[in-house]
Amino acid sequence: MLHCSLWKKRWVRGLALGALYGAAWSAHGHVLPSALPPPVLHAAAPAQAAVLAAAPPRSDAAAKPYQMRVVGGLANVNQYKRWEEPFWTQTLPRLSAGRFSAEIVPFDRAGVPGQEMLRLLQLGVVPFGTVLMASLAAQYPRYTAPDLAGLNPDMASLRQSLAAFRPYLEQNLREQQGVEALAVYVYPAQVLFCRKPLSGLTDLVGRRVRVSSSGQADFVEALGAMAVFTDFSQVAASMQSGAVDCAVTGTLSGNTLGLHRLSTHLYPMPLTWGLAIFAANRRAWEGLPPDLRTLLRRELPRLEASIWEAAQRDTAEGIACNTGARTCAPEQRGDMALVPVSAQDDRQRQTLFATVVLPRWLQRCGRSCAQVWNQTIGPARGLPAPTTY
């Protein structure tokens, strides 16, 4: 256990250094020498192999498991605690009878800037990792299309948008970034927690609203609010200090942060959901044993399905607990007022998406993205890209 602990500390330090130097090296067009040990364990060196060859054969039970290294999603939320971490540390060893295992750390505790995750996967600094789709808005805006603010008022709509976009997403990541997309996870609905009363979207005029993506910023600014970008870990402090009047975050993750004690009104319209891509550096992926790749191809879709089902449950549970449901634990039970989403607000959501969010995304993304949209999500949702933006 001591060896494992020391290895993890060195690995986390390596990730931090990789993130730091990766941006600098890539800015000059170089390939970064990995700051980590090789992505997966390799065969013994020739001298070791000679010794092993002379030694008596060991049983499979005595052999060390083949170990992967994974960077996961956000720490301290259900997706990581209940699904990602147990899958890699418990389910994988169980399904492989102990032959395969993995070490995993959440990216926000590994010194890895979220916006650099895809680049670090591309370089191989991170061999296997979870990429928050919203973090790609600046460098890779085209990949954020399925979860633009105001596009998906419910999970059925989100599934439809992702299904239409996924073939393009997987192909483009493989061909342009050398990254293999293996699963797409989802967080609970991202909704509004406010410290002051509101009756609907129009009441956001003049308020400072915490957001986590450019699309969310476009949406709230179109309503007359001021968008404030704040890391997830700083949301509660920003609400408590009065730096923001409202915060967009997950229904249950907001509860975990204690927002049910810091805010008074909950507006449950999903502005976004929060998609995350679990992906692998292609060389690291192809370097895995074939039977491990087969196992992961079979089991990761099952993990994905479980996470999506849990996100829907967590969305409902978060709303219930924030508003004082007796079925929730006392420490989770809030006293927030639940603001109903009116038909007028839903029409306004659709208008803002078509006239503000989608055109601004196209401005950031470029003209080719209009073509991508019109070949994927646009026809699936009946939302063609505007001809001028």
Predicted regions and their residues:
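N-terminal signal peptide c-region/cleavage motif recognized by signal peptidases
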Residues: 24-28
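Short, solvent-exposed loop/beta-turn-alpha elements that line the ligand-binding surface or hinge
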Residues: 153-176
